[in-house]
């Protein structure tokens, strides 16, 4: 439960039709197994106590009496488990029979929640046996079921853990999800962070994917987690087959899935990040948490971690993480999705630049080309902008400006790239200009300090700006999102342009966009050049090459691996992760990588230090298009004072090991 992680389970054990005792035995065994794994919330299918396909046997008192007896036994025999269980069962109330979910925790039946919408079409005929909950018949107060010693609430409940108040869940049953206005809408708006669905939907061709798509959208629009548990083996196959399909979504992202017909596996276990959900609800001010009318019960329960009220953070158990955290969160895992995203990124860049060029009546686009990844992507976007405007690519003026650290390899790549794309190429050596500047300010050329490096960067920007004036053009910036986060840019040097097309794209994603273009360009020379650029170490080339003429100054040796920094950037900006939680997630994500825990912590410290110290550069960024959900534009997504102090974050990092 530390860091906001709650372990949940969807359990679909083999059901024995019309035998509540046998089913209770299976449920008790499953709950003990789940508790051994640290599960805090366990869900079972719709009508799990009897099976969904009992037919007219649901009307028999003997069956219903047994259900109540066995529910009380489940409560007794799981009283020492620190979890809440949601179990489907037929329940009598006020002379009617209802299809319900029964919530049990620490030996107590907390409440009974009835299904709100009864399907009575196609293969379903639930109205034959079950009533629709109605306030007209039940009255304004929640009825009390003496035999179960608990309340029956037709308007649903929100269950809140007093030990950890962020742990709040609501329930809907099968068909409730499929209607135009599901109960989960109001439950989420009133504060529920997890929705449990006890289901018994039969399996037909295409239904599993459709079911997932509906759940994906429901969890995304309600900024909640959704735990779906479907009935499976043991149900009657007279007319239908039940697959035991179970899965969990978190804010539109699939966390885990037990595939349909996987009867050998009767339990799905994963972790839900409540902190992530809360952060997004606070961030999205249009989400109406706490403001929606909810007439149901708010039921408190304790898992025994706090003596009275919320437990101190140090007393909460640490949830073992099994969920997957991608090492490259900006990069889709699926190749088709990655290709589609790369195509969209290039289009966004090109359209943004096209609009700016047209608005300023520019006669050219001027770009500094280094032979590296960032300038290559900026040039590709500029070439595409020309194509969209229906003009010759000669409109783009690419400028190489070799100096002290330029290698023959990168210079050749830059020239080959420009020739392959058909843009106008300028080569303007700047070494003499920089030496003249050194003489003007009294700097020794043999002193390779920050003056030596930044003078070259600013000279390149000066050349680009003046050339743009001469050509009635606009300087296109090449700096990327990762560099902006770290402040890895010379202030008023490569930091400055007239429109930055790469400002919303992290370094780890840029290489995949360039790779996509290389694979789909149908130009062998361009493909080979882009491939060579992809294989070149990332470097500003501001220090002299080594004795073999190779790049000596490698960015990742100085500021750290971009794979780590982009990981940090994503979780800090997108989900507001504090350092301790971020370090924990990073260790999980990179546990099978070349990065040790010590290495991760080293660069995590560096990331926070640079992120805070370099905000002054971000606060005066040129315009540039937003591309993804993480962006650092001071006019949009990230507004932070340049003199904000990082002490709180630094102190937390200091405690890590």
Kindly label every feature range from the protein language model:
Residues 1-366, 384-393, 425:
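Enzyme catalytic cores with a strong preference for nitrogen-chemistry domains
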Residues 23, 165, 223-224, 233-236, ...:
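ATP/NTP-dependent adenylation/nucleotidyl-transfer catalytic domains that generate, transfer
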């Amino acid at each position: 439960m530390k860091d906001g992680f709650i372990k949940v389970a969807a359990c679909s054990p083999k059901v024995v039709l019309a035998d509540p005792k046998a089913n209770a035995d299976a449920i008790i065994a499953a709950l003990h197994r789940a508790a051994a794994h640290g599960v805090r919330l366990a869900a079972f299918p719709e009508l799990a106590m009897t099976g969904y396909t009992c037919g007219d046997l649901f009307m028999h008192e003997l069956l219903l009496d047994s259900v109540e007896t066995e529910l009380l036994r489940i409560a007794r025999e799981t009283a020492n488990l620190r979890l809440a269980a949601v179990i489907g069962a037929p329940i009598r109330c006020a002379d009617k029979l209802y299809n319900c979910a029964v919530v049990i925790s620490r030996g107590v039946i907390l409440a009974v929640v009835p299904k709100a919408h009864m399907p009575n079409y196609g293969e379903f005929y639930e109205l034959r046996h079950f009533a629709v909950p109605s306030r007209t018949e039940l009255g304004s107060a929640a009825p009390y079921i003496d035999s179960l010693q608990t309340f029956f609430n037709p308007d649903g409940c929100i269950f809140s853990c007093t030990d950890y108040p962020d742990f709040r869940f609501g329930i809907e049953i099968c068909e409730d999800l499929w209607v135009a206005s599901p109960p989960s809408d109001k439950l989420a708006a009133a504060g529920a962070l997890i929705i449990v669905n006890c289901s018994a939907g039969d399996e037909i061709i295409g239904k599993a994917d459709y079911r997932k798509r509906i759940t994906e959208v429901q969890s995304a629009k309600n900024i909640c987690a959704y735990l779906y548990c479907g009935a499976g083996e043991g149900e009657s196959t007279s007319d239908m087959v039940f697959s035991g399909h179970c899965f969990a979504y978190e804010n539109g992202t699939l966390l885990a899935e037990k595939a349909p017909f996987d009867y050998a596996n009767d339990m799905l276990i994963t972790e839900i990040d409540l902190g992530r959900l809360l952060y997004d609800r606070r961030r999205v001010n249009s989400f109406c948490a706490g403001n929606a009318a909810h007439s149901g019960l708010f039921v408190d329960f304790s898992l025994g971690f706090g003596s009275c009220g919320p437990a101190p953070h140090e007393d909460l158990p640490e949830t073992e993480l099994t969920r997957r955290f991608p090492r490259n969160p900006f990069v889709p895992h699926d190749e088709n999705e990655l290709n589609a995203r790369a195509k969209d990124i290039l289009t966004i860049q090109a359209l943004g630049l096209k609009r700016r060029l047209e608005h300023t009546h520019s006669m050219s686009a001027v770009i500094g080309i280094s032979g590296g990844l960032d300038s290559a992507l900026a040039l590709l976007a500029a070439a595409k902008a020309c194509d969209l405007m229906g003009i010759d690519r000669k409109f783009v003026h690419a400028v190489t400006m070799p100096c002290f650290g330029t290698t023959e390899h990168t210079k050749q790549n830059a020239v080959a790239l420009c020739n392959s794309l058909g843009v106008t190429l300028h080569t303007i050596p700047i070494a003499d200009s920089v030496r003249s500047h050194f003489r003007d300010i009294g700097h020794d050329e043999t002193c390779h300090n920050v003056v030596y490096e930044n003078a070259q960067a600013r000279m390149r920007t000066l050349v680009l700006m003046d050339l743009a004036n001469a050509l009635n053009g606009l300087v296109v910036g090449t700096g990327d999102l990762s560099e902006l986060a770290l402040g890895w840019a010379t202030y008023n040097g490569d930091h400055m342009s007239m429109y930055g097309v790469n400002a919303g794209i992290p370094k780890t994603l840029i290489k995949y966009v360039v790779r996509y273009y290389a694979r789909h360009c149908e130009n062998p020379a361009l493909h080979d050049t882009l491939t060579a650029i992809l294989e070149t170490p990332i470097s500003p080339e501001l220090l002299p090459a080594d004795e073999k003429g190779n790049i000596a100054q490698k960015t990742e040796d100085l500021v750290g691996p971009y794979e780590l920094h982009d990981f940090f950037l994503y979780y800090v900006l997108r989900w507001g992760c504090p350092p301790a939680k971020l370090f924990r997630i990073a260790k999980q994500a990179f546990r099978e990588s070349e990065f040790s825990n010590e290495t991760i912590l080293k660069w995590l410290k560096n990331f926070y230090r640079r992120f805070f110290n370099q905000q002054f550069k971000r606060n005066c960024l040129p315009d540039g298009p937003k591309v993804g959900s993480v962006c650092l534009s001071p006019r949009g997504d990230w507004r932070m004072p340049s003199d904000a102090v990082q002490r709180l974050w630094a102190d937390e990092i200091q405690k890590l090991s």
